[in-house]
From Swiss-Prot:
The chain crosses the membrane at residues 519-539, 560-580. Changing residue 765 to N: In CHTE; impairs IGSF1 trafficking to the plasma membrane. It comes from Homo sapiens. This is Immunoglobulin superfamily member 1. Glycans are attached at residues 53, 338, 374, 381, 607, 747, 798, 846, 939, 986, 1027, 1082, 1147, 1223. Residues 38-122, 137-222, 226-312, 321-408, 419-500, 589-677, 686-760, 777-869, 873-958, 965-1060, 1065-1150, 1161-1242 form the Ig-like C2-type domain. Residues 29-518, 581-1336 are extracellular. GO terms for cellular component: extracellular region; membrane.
Amino acid sequence: MTLDRPGEGATMLKTFTVLLFCIRMSLGMTSIVMDPQPELWIESNYPQAPWENITLWCRSPSRISSKFLLLKDKTQMTWIRPSHKTFQVSFLIGALTESNAGLYRCCYWKETGWSKPSKVLELEAPGQLPKPIFWIQAETPALPGCNVNILCHGWLQDLVFMLFKEGYAEPVDYQVPTGTMAIFSIDNLTPEDEGVYICRTHIQMLPTLWSEPSNPLKLVVAGLYPKPTLTAHPGPIMAPGESLNLRCQGPIYGMTFALMRVEDLEKSFYHKKTIKNEANFFFQSLKIQDTGHYLCFYYDASYRGSLLSDVLKIWVTDTFPKTWLLARPSAVVQMGQNVSLRCRGPVDGVGLALYKKGEDKPLQFLDATSIDDNTSFFLNNVTYSDTGIYSCHYLLTWKTSIRMPSHNTVELMVVDKPPKPSLSAWPSTVFKLGKAITLQCRVSHPVLEFSLEWEERETFQKFSVNGDFIISNVDGKGTGTYSCSYRVETHPNIWSHRSEPLKLMGPAGYLTWNYVLNEAIRLSLIMQLVALLLVVLWIRWKCRRLRIREAWLLGTAQGVTMLFIVTALLCCGLCNGVLIEETEIVMPTPKPELWAETNFPLAPWKNLTLWCRSPSGSTKEFVLLKDGTGWIATRPASEQVRAAFPLGALTQSHTGSYHCHSWEEMAVSEPSEALELVGTDILPKPVISASPTIRGQELQLRCKGWLAGMGFALYKEGEQEPVQQLGAVGREAFFTIQRMEDKDEGNYSCRTHTEKRPFKWSEPSEPLELVIKEMYPKPFFKTWASPVVTPGARVTFNCSTPHQHMSFILYKDGSEIASSDRSWASPGASAAHFLIISVGIGDGGNYSCRYYDFSIWSEPSDPVELVVTEFYPKPTLLAQPGPVVFPGKSVILRCQGTFQGMRFALLQEGAHVPLQFRSVSGNSADFLLHTVGAEDSGNYSCIYYETTMSNRGSYLSMPLMIWVTDTFPKPWLFAEPSSVVPMGQNVTLWCRGPVHGVGYILHKEGEATSMQLWGSTSNDGAFPITNISGTSMGRYSCCYHPDWTSSIKIQPSNTLELLVTGLLPKPSLLAQPGPMVAPGENMTLQCQGELPDSTFVLLKEGAQEPLEQQRPSGYRADFWMPAVRGEDSGIYSCVYYLDSTPFAASNHSDSLEIWVTDKPPKPSLSAWPSTMFKLGKDITLQCRGPLPGVEFVLEHDGEEAPQQFSEDGDFVINNVEGKGIGNYSCSYRLQAYPDIWSEPSDPLELVGAAGPVAQECTVGNIVRSSLIVVVVVALGVVLAIEWKKWPRLRTRGSETDGRDQTIALEECNQEGEPGTPANSPSSTSQRISVELPVPI
């Protein structure tokens, strides 16, 4: 803290001014526990000449210590470590000389370090004792009549202490204590005891050898004058480095003012004498240690002082401490209740403001003078509109650079009953064999109890405190639809709305209706074929018992049924052929990566560790397998989702092939690539792979080793030397063939070596054959939506080609993950759609597709980078030089991330794919928009992601609006809460525009200076005007103020007139024909003033600007409102001001509420817990309307008079003798207008326990039912037609050949009977009957 010089301000006295105030007692504060100081004194064995041999003693006041330190002139002189812990030690000085003279202090060692130093002992030239230390202790409150102790501390034993007072030649008191300190007591303090005191000492045996006098000490008796006031300007809370002025003001002129800080009275004590009745103590550059409680007082020339001022707490901080907000009685309240939001923070003397998320202006204010332990923000008679997230902020009336931190928030929910929770299943909604499912019911606020319901069983109900319910599937009884609800502690009798239903399925997995229908048709066809075969055999062997008519009818029925089934199968096949094929991608768990590390580069096999890393962020466990048998399991070692498997020294027992898997929830990933350890001195052979070979294009071959920092070589079969060779590049290397030709075909392999042993090569990899084949052109590949997606999103890949009837393959990072059969599309095109229903963190990567027809393949498509966001923190996006760019100029968008070595992408709102990509080694990337035009205007954002692990990306940055224009858009100026402000209140003028990151300037008409808000990073700039007065009213405008050089034109905002009210008598406001009118009618609001020649202003509650102004010739203004609408409803008032003093307005008129309605809107009616009566249970009907202050009525069909009235809209219905069943409706009326009733609600039907049960009626059920009906009807028609034909057939057969038919039946009965000769008449007749056809 710096203070001005005495001529300019306050100066700190070198004397100690002591006030007899029990400061901490008067403040009600707890004394600060300070570390006790050690005591330092002198001893000498030469009483006549003590400076001949001096020893300094240092004593710890409260504990023993192992080390003591002696300081001289603030530098270390010597330190002593005694042989055992002790309270005191001695430092031998010897004879006092010029070199020994100086300031001495001592310290002792404690657990936390060195203690505070002792009081200063000054050794001066020989022949004079060091001056004592002098201070005062107050034992009682600082008022006349209290007792005071004056303490004088010397440096030798058995000294004589003398107390002197200014103006007296003789000492007023003396003492000879046994120690080194004397205590002088002044009892019953009076004003005569005021004055300046000093203390001196001398040795008893040398009475003429006096010490130097102590520092003078002023004794001021308080309470003779009234207490002053202490204020801080600009405010009591400031940032380090800012200036502060503490003003102490009293009622008497010409006094001396004193300022002190309670925490350090000796070092923070300042005096200032002025000719006025106030003194300013100026802090030029505040420091953190200036924080504390400050007091001031004043005294006259006779040291008669005033009472202490009130305590003023000064905060010096660069960041405000957080406020906390608490809702009482609960954050979940019912409609119509009152809620208090209690906001508290550690900073005193500052106002508080209550904000609601989504609203710019504060809802309520608490002035600093009105805040105490019982003060809160109140929300009375809450409605649905009060639901939201609230926060509390400090309300500063002065300007400071202190940063505002994030604040504690409270989410207030206003419900007729608590909102529904969320219900999820872990690990999935499908039962696995022998496994249970945990249903998790969750809500964001404290809950008393959760309840789980099972829709298939009405009596089923489980309760849980933590919301977890374990469901087993014993005998298949766990499947079904579940929902949950909860109740809170403040309303234990009210259960919340039910959650969305969640269906649990059996181990068979997910079944679609198409699959069920196809399988049912196939099974029916097989059954029909078997049945037809049995009928034929039955007729063949058992026809003796069956008449021909019955057999024929049965066969006909079977044939017709088969005909319908075959037709249905053909229709399904044709439909499937016409539709474009869409294949759901069952994403495998990402394949992990396996490699080896060692800390012995020259002999890596001496200590080898295998590492397994998964690209997924949800890996629970890793498994390492050797030769597919033995395994070791371990958990991830860090957030990088990798695990170590130490093998130690490699021996023969370690040789083999290693794989690793990652375990996620209930799924195991594919195995990693094999790592084969073949010996103790042989490196494992690497793995070689390549992308598809295309003639004339670049080809990359990937060689993957197993250790870090390896060198690589590429070999081609038939050549002795390596084709390409790379130095130590890592665990993998890429060899490039610039242009693939016929000469490049052949078998390739690669080898590796360690960096320290470049001549020790590994085994060669397995050979890879490169063959150039004739190929179709590459397909067109894209995503239907943006390739930058959030977890859980739905992604569809579209792979298309002009060729027809092709099969498609989808690749991820070069590996095949899905395929599609030939697509029977319309002529001229063929396509396949690959679908990821819910994207996970591990699904990111580079996707591509190919198509093929028999042995001919296409070239790979261009890759699509799928980036899954929300894994890393979001970056920041800035525009350089600024977000407003002149057409034809360039702008740089810098995306600043958190991690280094990432890949950045720039996105524009409305664009399907990212605009630009950048891979950088640092943590930021610059995107250049060159020669921008109007089409480049829009919102931009950016992300960063890692390319080595499934393209896991960050959150999207905050959008940045780029304007390409030659003129800044016009900002908008408005006042909050209104441009009509009462005298003495606060108002904020907001300059808001669409351009972000630009400062604003506020202009007032008639003034040359402007108020500026620099560096605004939000949409708006705030210009607060506190304690508004007549000088604040007038016309205002604002404009942008960019902090970069630009030729873009700047245009001013609208003009805002700021009116100050409370300077004239209030007017009256009336409505003609009345305060309630029907929509479309006309209304006139009449504002009657007290003075002529006035301008009248009409105001509406919630509007920030006046609705209309009029300058009538008389005392009244008529505001005509033609064809009013519903939005004209509200609370109106008016003011007026004189032409001679514009903007100095009257008080507000009394408020007038206007209703524009012919009939209030109809309410809603619902039933709780359901619309079905259960045994012994009542139903509560809840009628809710949009307007407050109403009375509800419930009506029951069949009853002439209304059944019940209610103010809260709840009606309890019982079902005694079945009288509660039926249709209900409700309506309401306004209490202010009891003759106007609303429209009735939609009817609601209550049914009994045996009432109709709702059946699921889906499109699939309708289709299947219709198909069955058609088949049965058609079969019935065919059978009826055939039955009608049979009598004619029978008659015709009897008339023509009845005898032959009888013979045929008899011979059919004798068929196969033994003993019948082949050439007998019977057999002959039989052969004849078989050859004759039966007429039909």
